[in-house]
Amino acid sequence: MPLQAPSIGEKFPEIEVMTTHGKIKLPDHFRGKWFVLFSHPADFTPVCTTEFVAFAKRYEDFKKLNTELIGLSVDSTFSHIKWAEWIKEKLGVEIPFPIIADPTGEVAKKLGLLHAQSSTATVRAVFVVDDKGVVRAILYYPQEVGRNIDEILRLIESLQISDKYGRAIPANWPNNELIGDNLIVPPAATVQEAEERLKKFKCFDWWFCYEDKATAEEKELARKFLKRVANC
């Protein structure tokens, strides 16, 4: 993977890109908002088409989380536009977000998104970038498997809740098998803190404590995403 490829916790690189909505400077274009940059192997392919329809249908859910979307592949702007037109005409779904045109592959190279065996195919990847321009999550999928958009939504909400409350998010939250919709308290830093937390929080042991912190609205939104994940 190229040295420039960002890692989790690093700033998203400053790049200017051409999109179906014109020139955009990343990450500044989305300053104050979260954004999801997702790459796809190619326009006019079945799996990618299903993904774009799914992203478009969930677009308002992303906006409720102060999150924007932007696609990317090593296709031209013309190809992106014609593909989006085909999706609207044939499938009745309008693509409301920009798609980066990268026919030379330069943007994909900077982000480490080209297949190792090919210089003309983008991997199926997702970058989740927060409102400060920091990469918070990176997901990779095989070519033959499309992404689950509702899980990406649940991931973003979980990261935002973790930031808000300073707590960690358990597996399958808010329907975790051990602690339900509670949040995990960070590990104790001292012996005294470890002893005190046993009195202050619900705990399985000093290193595994949890509390009910998120609001009812936050839990309900996450349950909606999780339910749709389960039903897919």
UniProtKB/Swiss-Prot annotation:
Query: What NCBIfam families does the record point to?
Result: PRK13189.1
Which organism was this protein described from? Hyperthermus butylicus (strain DSM 5456 / JCM 9403 / PLM1-5)
Report the domain of life of the source organism. Answer: Archaea
Q: Which family does this protein fall into?
A: Belongs to the peroxiredoxin family. Prx6 subfamily.
**Pfam families hit by this protein:** 1-cysPrx_C, AhpC-TSA
Query: What compartments host this protein?
Result: Cytoplasm
- Function, as annotated: Thiol-specific peroxidase that catalyzes the reduction of hydrogen peroxide and organic hydroperoxides to water and alcohols, respectively. Plays a role in cell protection against oxidative stress by detoxifying peroxides.
Q: A Gene Ontology biological process annotation? A: hydrogen peroxide catabolic process
- The protein, known as: Peroxiredoxin
Q: What is the lineage of its organism?
A: Archaea, Thermoproteota, Thermoprotei, Desulfurococcales, Pyrodictiaceae
Positions annotated to bind substrate: R124
Could you say which EC number(s) this protein's record lists?
1.11.1.24
